Amino acid sequence: MLVLGLETSCDETGVALYDSERGLLADALFSQIDLHRVFGGVVPELASRDHVKRMLPLIRQVLDEAGCVATEIDAIAYTAGPGLVGALLVGASCAQALAFAWDIPAIGVHHMEGHLLAPMLEENPPQFPFVALLVSGGHTQLVRVDGIGQYELLGESLDDAAGEAFDKTAKLIGLNYPGGPEIARLAERGVPGRFVFPRPMTDRPGLAFSFSGLKTFALNTWQQCRDAGDDNEQTRCDVSLAFQQAVVETLTIKCKRALKQTGLKRLVIAGGVSANKALRASLEDMLGSIKGNVYYARPQFCTDNGAMIAYAGCQRLLAGQQQDLAISVQARWPMEQLPPL
């Protein structure tokens, strides 16, 4: 089965072709970072308009790259949520229009299920069951995964997601959008131990997260340095390092708890923050200490992309899941509501 995947949940237009027998044939991505940077964050209306502009050229690009023609496509998968409604509607309407024109099925895919399954595109994919850490700009969740659609939420953030905290903290200390990569870059030049930030909610049992207080702690630290005339580039690097260390250690502690609670020794990390090198290194060390394994996608498939949507949609289509031509998207969509395969 050859599936065209379309991703438009936020500020990246992703298109890919995935074949159930040959694997990923082509993928293309257009990032809107430059468009939104001047505003310090994503502007939903601008995001939607740019998706409209980029979608068809990217579809042509992946067809050319794969050496395929439209008549060879068996189905279309598109992101149906969660995400920005206007942006989601661009991908959904394009998918359903093409599906109607080509007389093929279209299926809406859960954005975070796409992220969760992205490591399946790698040479050494994880085997079920496993614990997944979904960590992005909109989500920080620990999930037990027994199969596709078989998800048990173990814990999640009570306020800001980890990726959101990265971006907001970066903005507070004067870094450009997107803030996560900027903090990671500056943290490499930070002096360890100059600042020590708290590890929120690690002093109590449970698997819930909270990052809003950590963001406030970073702001107060930066303001104190600024009041003392010490708001220079090195201080910015030191604050970035302290913040990143706090987030990484918090996530690592909670992952270790989740693995102990479930009795599993396989961990998948997925979502944009999973590209963070410090997080990967910390989780690899932790899994090594308990003789477990950690899995993640290549960096280009950690952030939003069409390949993960094509793959996830293909699995559900192969299992016989169908959908009518109604255009339906959801800004919020708990992953536990998905039907199991």
Swiss-Prot record:
Substrate binds at L134, V135, S136, G137, G138, D167, G180, N276. It comes from the Bacteria. It is an enzyme of class 2 (transferase). Its main location: cytoplasm. Fe cation binds at H111, H115, D304. Keywords: Acyltransferase, Cytoplasm, Iron, Metal-binding, Transferase, tRNA processing. Its cofactor is Fe(2+). It catalyses: L-threonylcarbamoyladenylate + adenosine(37) in tRNA = N(6)-L-threonylcarbamoyladenosine(37) in tRNA + AMP + H(+). It holds the Pfam family TsaD. GO terms for molecular function: iron ion binding; N(6)-L-threonylcarbamoyladenine synthase activity. GO terms for cellular component: cytoplasm. SUPFAM superfamilies: Actin-like ATPase domain. One of its GO terms (biological process) is tRNA threonylcarbamoyladenosine modification. Binds 1 Fe(2+) ion per subunit. The keyword Iron applies. It is found in: Cytoplasm. Its EC number is 2.3.1.234. Belongs to the KAE1 / TsaD family. Required for the formation of a threonylcarbamoyl group on adenosine at position 37 (t(6)A37) in tRNAs that read codons beginning with adenine. Is involved in the transfer of the threonylcarbamoyl moiety of threonylcarbamoyl-AMP (TC-AMP) to the N6 group of A37, together with TsaE and TsaB. TsaD likely plays a direct catalytic role in this reaction. HAMAP family: TsaD. This is tRNA N6-adenosine threonylcarbamoyltransferase. The lineage of its organism: Bacteria, Pseudomonadati, Pseudomonadota, Gammaproteobacteria, Pseudomonadales. The gene is tsaD.
